[in-house]
Structure formats: structure tokens, C-alpha cells
Amino acid sequence: MKSRLILAAITTIGLVAATGETVATEKISLRVTPNVSNAPSNVIVKATVPKHADNRWLLVEADSGAFYRSSAIQLDGENAPLVTEFRFNNLPSGEYTVAAVLRNNLGQETTVRRTVLVLSRFGEP
């Protein structure tokens, strides 16, 4: 009986934690292609932001530490497109963190990140 209660408690905690994460990622999702490519690489970033009156800004950035590129657009709340596409052309080799930051009308931010590997012609980042 005691083990069932412990199992139920762990399951409940896990579901609450998972639900919290799901809510956060529903505000914005990110698809980056290709995940691995050769330099110079053209990377396409598709940010999906559900329409909401509070959405104001979307910033997407690619950062390898040695190279940085970003782009931002203003969102028109419920009239903004569901999917916004960004292109980062001719990225040099490196391991990039691609991040999308959604800012609402109160200045609160939601961030999602992906990793992209751009290899040199010798097969190294």
C-alpha cells in the first residue's frame, strides 16, 4: 500500500512537471534545418507562434561564440502569422545555438533553443 502511494505521488509530480513544460513550449516552437551541414551553410529557422493578443516581438539568433547573426520582427498580436521563417545564409563552421525569443506586451520573454552543427570542409566544426 505504501509503495502505491509513493508511486502515485511520483507520477503526479512527473505529470505536473511535464504539464508545466508543455505550457511553456506551446507559446513558441522552433524548427531548424538542416541540423548538420557543411560550411558555408544556409540555415532555415521556422518559428511557430500561436496567435495571441499579447504577442509583440519575435527575435531569432544564431550564435557560435565566434559568429553571431540575428533577426527580429514585430508581431501584431492576433493578426500575426502563425509561422515566421528566418534564413541565415552563409554561416561559417561552428556549433550554433539557435534561439527564438517571444516577447509579450508586458516585456515577459519565452525562449526556445536548438543546436545546429556547421562543419568545415574538413569535417570539423
Go through each PLM region and give its residues.
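Short, compositionally biased P/S/T/A/G/V-rich stretches that sit at domain boundaries
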Residues: 20-43, 123-125
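Aromatic/hydrophobic beta-strand junction motif of beta-rich domains
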Residues: 45-51
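Aromatic sugar-binding surface patches on proteins
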Residues: 78-85
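Surface-exposed, short loops/turns at beta-strand junctions within beta-sandwich domains
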Residues: 88-94
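A short tyrosine-centered beta-strand micro-motif
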Residues: 94-101
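Short acidic/polar inter-strand loop motif in beta-rich domains
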Residues: 102-113
